[in-house]
Amino acid sequence: MDAAAVISLFILGSVLVTCSILLSSFSSRLGIPILVIFLAIGMLAGIDGIGGIPFDNYPFAYMVSNLALAVILLDGGMRTQASSFRVALWPALSLATVGVLITSALTGMMAAWLFKLDLIEGLLIGAIVGSTDAAAVFSLLGGKGLNERVGSTLEIESGSNDPMAVFLTITLIEMIQQHQTGLSWMFAVHIIQQFGLGIAIGLGGGYLLLQMINRIVLPAGLYPLLALSGGIMIFAVTTSLDGSGILAVYLCGFLLGNRPIRNRHGILQNFDGLAWLAQIAMFLVLGLLVTPSDLLPIAIPALLLSMWMIFIARPLSVFAGLLPFRGFNLRERVFISWVGLRGAVPIILAVFPMMAGLDNARLFFNVAFFVVLVSLLLQGTSLSWAAKKAKVVVPPISWPISRVGLDIHPENPWEQFVYQLGADKWCIGAALRDLHMPPETRIAALFRNNVLLHPTGSTRLREGDILCVIGREHDLPALGKMFSQSPPVALDQRFFGDFILDAEARFADVAQIYGLDGGEEFREHQQSLGEVVQQLLGAAPVVGDQVEFAGMVWTVAEKENDHVLKVGVRVAEDEAE
């Protein structure tokens, strides 16, 4: 390749990435998932599009996609809170194993019938599209305000279900190549190896990487690169040992994000941009790889297969996978069934048969691409609507427009949060002394019209003021309520109830005030309101959990770890309104 060709590639790549970034701003206005925009640009630049670029380098696409997935999952793992694992680990693992098996089997049998394939080839299609995609889930669920149980289950499922899909795909390809029709006992050994090595190397390598970052003094800009290179190394080593590199790099990121780490915010800020670049590159390359004209002949059976997977296979797998977990109500199960988002992983898995030289490899790839496209367009565009219908969205709180870590020491928890006050903030006009700041938080600076003020307790807040607050991460919910908009008060009342009570209040006293019947056993044992609600829920509580008892609807309004702090209450008849 000469210098002119290299420069041409640079120009082409930069133009495609720039177009993807600029057009991404239209995705929210059009209601189209941003990943579809990236995919469409790749298709337009491809052989059947206006770009006319011939691209069929499957090994290169495989390499780029795996590298991008490693970056996305490393970033996603760092942003997953440990509390999410406490709430959703076992349900998510059930969906990642039992759920993927059921989805793959049901989808595979339908694929064999629709495309007139051997059963084992149909099952291969089912395995290829059997797992949800972490890149799609992290991208599309961000900012939706889902309750913690639902959001965490979907995120952890997407980060941990790829080992099963990868293993099924590789196993079925080997069986087709060797003309086998039955499974051997090695099936179980391989799947244990995938999960076992993924967990062991991910956590072990993540711990070593954490110690390296905290013990070695480097310029601030090198810590993100060290974390990135370490994460990719863990991904590559695990994959080379026939373990799940995807699971390993996700757990590595989770460990880094939930332990004290040097320059944490610098790493996260850099990872945010790198994750976006990885998504753009991955979907552009996968879009270039497909030939749209090849999708037309299979459009009808592929659409029927997509509908079968979305409306039959995924719901059945979710209800079966969540059967042992009574903490999920029917609405939450239905919503999780709907969010079976497919993305880059099925397309990457569809490259495996191409590289193995199977007879129907091109068909497998086109079907997988079509299923992903339908999933993103149908499920991706309707996520917000489905979340509201299923009532799994909790009222939002105000988040800072900027947050910067005070990286004095890896163990230092303090950060600076920046809030800008709009006209709709309830605290406008209030004196600083009247703000009920969380304990140990301080207003470090107040800017008005780009001028730094020296505020006193009598200083009143005005529209447009910018406050810099020193606090810790667990102070964000309280600060968010303090600097929230006025209208959400009514929204809070509709969602949580007319009154929000302290969970430490005795249930007997609350029952007497409201004139409630029932709950004698709770009164006799002098249980608190929070204890009663947790006992009725029967699972680790999350904000937004509701239970109807004694003619009232009790809603978890605030919690810390697994303990309920505030409970909303309203009359049960209001539920129908």
UniProtKB/Swiss-Prot annotation:
Domain of life according to the entry: Bacteria
Protein keywords: Antiport, Cell inner membrane, Cell membrane, Ion transport, Membrane, Potassium, Potassium transport, Transmembrane, Transmembrane helix, Transport
Reactions performed catalytically: K(+)(in) + H(+)(out) = K(+)(out) + H(+)(in)
Predominant location: membrane
Family annotation (SMART domains): CorC_HlyC
Subcellular location: Cell inner membrane
Cell inner membrane among keywords: yes
Residue intervals of the RCK C-terminal domain: 403-485
GO-annotated molecular function: flavin adenine dinucleotide binding; potassium:proton antiporter activity
Record family assignment: Belongs to the monovalent cation:proton antiporter 1 (CPA1) transporter (TC 2.A.36) family. NhaP2 subfamily.
Function: K(+)/H(+) antiporter that extrudes potassium in exchange for external protons and maintains the internal concentration of potassium under toxic levels.
Keyword Iron: no
Pfam families: CorC_HlyC (PF03471), Na_H_Exchanger (PF00999), TrkA_C (PF02080)
Name of the featured protein: K(+)/H(+) antiporter NhaP2
Transmembrane segments: 3-23, 30-50, 58-78, 95-115, 122-142, 185-205, 216-236, 237-257, 280-300, 303-323, 334-354, 363-383
